Swiss-Prot record:
Residues 218-227, 304-324, 522-540, 648-667 have a biased composition (Low complexity). This is Probable E3 ubiquitin-protein ligase IRF2BPL. GO terms for cellular component: extracellular space; nucleoplasm; nucleus. The modification Phosphoserine is found at S69, S215, S519, S547, S639, S657, S658, S659, S662. It comes from Homo sapiens. InterPro entries: I2BP1/2_C3HC4-RING_sf (IPR044882), Interferon_reg_fac2-bd1_2_Znf (IPR022750). Pathway: Protein modification; protein ubiquitination. Residues 232-248 have a biased composition (Gly residues). Highly expressed in the heart, moderately in skeletal muscle and pancreas, and weakly in brain, kidney, liver, testis, thyroid gland and lymphocytes. Keywords: Coiled coil, Disease variant, Epilepsy, Intellectual disability, Isopeptide bond, Metal-binding, Nucleus, Phosphoprotein, Transferase, Ubl conjugation, Zinc, Zinc-finger. It is linked to Neurodevelopmental disorder with regression, abnormal movements, loss of speech, and seizures: An autosomal dominant disorder characterized by global developmental delay or neurodevelopmental regression, hypotonia, progressive ataxia, intellectual disability, seizures, and abnormal movements.
Amino acid sequence: MSAAQVSSSRRQSCYLCDLPRMPWAMIWDFSEPVCRGCVNYEGADRIEFVIETARQLKRAHGCFQDGRSPGPPPPVGVKTVALSAKEAAAAAAAAAAAAAAAQQQQQQQQQQQQQQQQQQQQQQQQQLNHVDGSSKPAVLAAPSGLERYGLSAAAAAAAAAAAAVEQRSRFEYPPPPVSLGSSSHTARLPNGLGGPNGFPKPTPEEGPPELNRQSPNSSSAAASVASRRGTHGGLVTGLPNPGGGGGPQLTVPPNLLPQTLLNGPASAAVLPPPPPHALGSRGPPTPAPPGAPGGPACLGGTPGVSATSSSASSSTSSSVAEVGVGAGGKRPGSVSSTDQERELKEKQRNAEALAELSESLRNRAEEWASKPKMVRDTLLTLAGCTPYEVRFKKDHSLLGRVFAFDAVSKPGMDYELKLFIEYPTGSGNVYSSASGVAKQMYQDCMKDFGRGLSSGFKYLEYEKKHGSGDWRLLGDLLPEAVRFFKEGVPGADMLPQPYLDASCPMLPTALVSLSRAPSAPPGTGALPPAAPSGRGAAASLRKRKASPEPPDSAEGALKLGEEQQRQQWMANQSEALKLTMSAGGFAAPGHAAGGPPPPPPPLGPHSNRTTPPESAPQNGPSPMAALMSVADTLGTAHSPKDGSSVHSTTASARRNSSSPVSPASVPGQRRLASRNGDLNLQVAPPPPSAHPGMDQVHPQNIPDSPMANSGPLCCTICHERLEDTHFVQCPSVPSHKFCFPCSRESIKAQGATGEVYCPSGEKCPLVGSNVPWAFMQGEIATILAGDVKVKKERDP
């Protein structure tokens, strides 16, 4: 047996798409064997419904009569029959003779067909003139490249002759003695066995569950082609009805019809009395224009059946069962047009909101710095509180979260606050106004789609601190004067505390950032988003700056987008990273001094200034790749001694591990160190007393490797140049960078035994609170220790 024959004998036809599949591509867990492609397309939860629909439709339309080749390999003792080339030629000659007779009969039926199709008379006439010789309205000569089972006139006529001659069941193999030239042999050319898919032979009245097709034998290629194109499946079991009245009684299996026919109303001449149904296990191709083979114009139908409903039926799931097509092309089983329109509008609205968010994040660095001080300060303060939860005033179960702010203005108009809200929480649906999300919440609550709400700020409440139950009106936090930047944000007692729900940490900013930030190698530096760089992988990312900024710099807020996009990556991977760190035998940097984990990093000046804006794709093609990189780096670059003795205030413990030995890993390791600490800031906010621990986490993220620096680092006090990996960084103000001598003097001046605040002399507050940050005792000891041995990456 040749390799081709072995291969064909192993193939099984899918019940829905009728394509020959290898056993590994078939799934047997349902009532009929189906291929993985159909299951994936329809969905495992709906596939049984689709199978039952297909079964009913095939039975209703007489698909299980003679002439269709069966499916799986034959059982033991049953031999398949293959025709030689000579026999195939004789069969083809007989088919041609039958075609001539069938053509004459079909031409008579064309007139009756046209009278029945009042709504489609003109299109029907054009189509009938194009049918290839046979002029049968349903058995079309479709282009072989477009339709899977286009039927030629000769093949269709041969099928008719075969069906008329053969009256016995197609499952009785081997066939009875029939002359080699008879077309009945042609109707069962492909090899197969007596039962479809191994099922027992069904009774004539119920018909087989499906007709599985084998690949044709290599020794009968010509005849098998004729069989597949013309007689595969009991195509025409009845010739024109001599009694007149109806159209010709032709039974054509749906799986042999073009998909444009399957998804549209079937012809009254093609299908028996049962009403037409929409089948189609796949979305159909675009219907051919009227007059072209396979186009809607070829659809014969009873009065009131519209051919245009083909596109309507194809627009919804093809698994809808027993859907009658009405005169207007409406399908009762489909989703109503108003629901479809509403869904379409919602998708468009969400796309527009995401576009606004993307634009806001992309231009934030340039725009926020140029905005008036009141606008900039308000945005910084509000951004430092995100994300936080909001709910609908009338239904507390409807929850969303505010995750970003921006200021917009039209020419000649004042600035107005814009806030971005995700609703429902974790859904990724973004609203760019409070009124928009309040309207949607109202519709979800009251099921009233007509009413709009005047002001969303009156209907939304925010929780000041997660879990406290202290819900306040959003309009009190953001009154009109604040929204138009006439006044500053109310006092700190009104500001919500950031909270990132661990169950749905993915913020919509990630979707926006990832979509516009292609992946880059781990060692690639981040570049500005709008920079027309030739390095496509990093062109959309922001370049990290290590040189000091002006004291009133909005650098932190300018990096909101990147911080947010990193934030939900960290939250997604937080638990895995914690396990990795604990397995590595050292504490997270944020825990190095034994303090509790700090709260989630607010997306404002604090975390943004202190954490370089880097996106997850830079660590690799996926977050998991980045996580693996984290684990590898943590396992080799740190030791328990490092983690406890040198904190990130000095930026040396982790920075030194990324020095000369492996330059390519510098950005990656700095990222890892920041993510280590930051992910501890993600899940639940403890009291502000834990915030001083933040200065362990962030400062090392500000100074960069010389590879990525755009300028020298200088001490804020003495203006001497700083070491790239060894200095003190204020976690609240990015421009506060200090050398060790100045930091040492400041600590001594403040008194090392009490609270020691920023060496600048200011009590720089933590974002979202009035509590100033202070050095931890371990950090003070490190700074006062004088010369610190900077360990190299490969040191024992």
